[in-house]
Amino acid sequence: MWNYSLTVEEVALVCQVGYERQAEMFGQPERNVNYYEGDHWEMLQHTICAGSELAFARMIGIKEFTPHVNKFKTELDVDGFEVRYTFPQGCNAPCCASESSRGRLRMTRRDDDDQIYVLLGGGLAIRTKMETPPYTMPPYVALGWAYGHECKKPEFIYNATTWYVPRADLHPMDTLDLSNVQGMRQLL
């Protein structure tokens, strides 16, 4: 119930979104807010995260959804939710987060305390060889959720502007209220 494998058409869509999210930064490493890993890795990271947004929309029954290009958090990732992604253990590509942050929901001081944040893992960060149709992608998995204010506790502080919430401290997905989601189907 709380996992979804993108179709090959959906992968093509999130690749386009990943490109568009990074395009305005091409060749300008000084514009990155945190640090710069190279446009190719930044674009891949945007692609993987756009995939997590699309997968979550499908998990909650939203069929008509395209991840937006807006990276400045003036729009929610999915109707009513912010989606965060955690890279899998053992991922050593430059676009993967540090080992200490894996399996955790990342929050910054810019994040809304009243918003719901959902953590996903898996998906396109897992390299696989697809040889025959239907070319099944590794599934994205919803790992848990929390309100922003629940994440900004002293025990989760990483540095002056960031918190990392362990998966064990997130609410189980089956407790997520989906009653206000437009286009939502009944989850069985």
Predicted regions mapped to residue ranges:
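Nucleic-acid endonuclease domains
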Residues: 1-77, 84-188
